[in-house]
Curated annotation (Swiss-Prot):
The family this protein is said to belong to: Belongs to the UPF0354 family.
Identification of the protein by name: UPF0354 protein BCE_4835
A Pfam family assignment: DUF1444
InterPro entries, alphabetized: DUF1444
HAMAP family: UPF0354
NCBIfam families: PRK13668.1
TM region positions: none
Highest taxon of the lineage: Bacteria
Length: 270
């Protein structure tokens, strides 16, 4: 049998066939690329070189190349999984519950307005964990939740501060994709609670901001309502336009129509 690049391509594709790998063939350059579907990382195999080895070693040449490609791709996949972190992300309760029909996301209830999803983060991008990915990772839902909350507590935070009409507003906006996630860090919330003299109000209008406010008067409630609405409208991944009073570990949504109010005591001046 005369071996050609095309025949070698077919032989390698047969031996390296896996549901998680893709093949691309450049007939001009006689190169076969085998890559991971999810990360697009892969190996290029120059077929004329393999054919030349086959002329000398026959079957052994094909086995060696197939083994090399397989081991390299498996090593790449392990490296990615080791580098990946699982982190929680906050989403609106209106966010889809399934990746596709019959494949629900892993979720946890949070507040009346928000829900917790879980992301597999590989630094450059992240993917929300659904049941199929959960099985692929070989983890249970409980393990995912525990790992995610542990990693959330390791996220750093540094607030910017602004005071208006006696009310103090603290803003966290690192743009790491997990600013709203910091709302799940109980020790962070407790440390803020200790420094706040009025009502502690918390808002996550979109993914890339966490607002904590020390509200001491009615004007402060108007400001936080307007502020949250503005951030919600501008956010790349909006979550909720409502803010929450935080007390004893619970979040109570505030239903306020933001408007300028004038308090009167019924007395005329003049």
């Amino acid at each position: 049998m005369k071996m050609t690049s095309k025949k070698m391509k077919d032989e390698l594709m047969k031996r390296l066939s896996r549901p998680e790998w893709d093949f691309q063939y450049d007939s001009e350059k006689e190169v076969l690329r085998i890559e991971q579907k999810d990360s697009k990382k892969g190996i290029n195999v120059s077929l004329p070189g393999v054919v030349a080895k086959w002329e000398v070693n026959k079957e052994k040449a094909i086995e060696e190349v197939a083994y090399y490609v397989q081991e390299a791709l498996i090593a790449m996949h392990k490296e990615e999984n080791n580098a990946a972190k699982i982190l929680p992300v906050i989403r609106s309760t209106s966010f889809p519950k399934q990746a596709e029909e019959g494949n629900p996301f892993i979720m946890t209830d949070h507040t009346a307005e928000t829900r917790i999803y879980y992301a597999l983060d590989s630094n450059k991008t992240y993917r929300l964990i659904d049941e199929r990915l959960l099985q692929k990772l070989g983890l249970t839902e409980q393990q995912v939740r525990e790992m995610a909350l542990f990693n959330a507590r390791s996220l750093g935070y540094e607030f910017k501060q602004d005071t208006v009409a006696g009310n103090t507003f603290y803003f966290l906006n690192t743009n790491d994709g997990y600013d709203a996630t910091r709302i799940l860090n109980e020790s962070l919330l407790q440390s803020m609670r200790e420094k706040i003299s009025g009502d502690m109000v918390v808002a996550v209008p979109h993914q890339d901001v966490l607002i904590i406010a020390d509200i001491v008067n009615e004007i402060g409630y108007d400001i936080i309502a307007q502020m949250t609405m503005k951030f919600f409208a501008e956010g790349h991944v909006p979550i909720t336009s409502l803010s929450f009073v935080y007390e004893d570990g619970d979040f109570e949504p505030i239903f306020i129509l933001a408007k300028n109010r004038k308090k009167t005591d019924g007395k005329e001046k003049g």
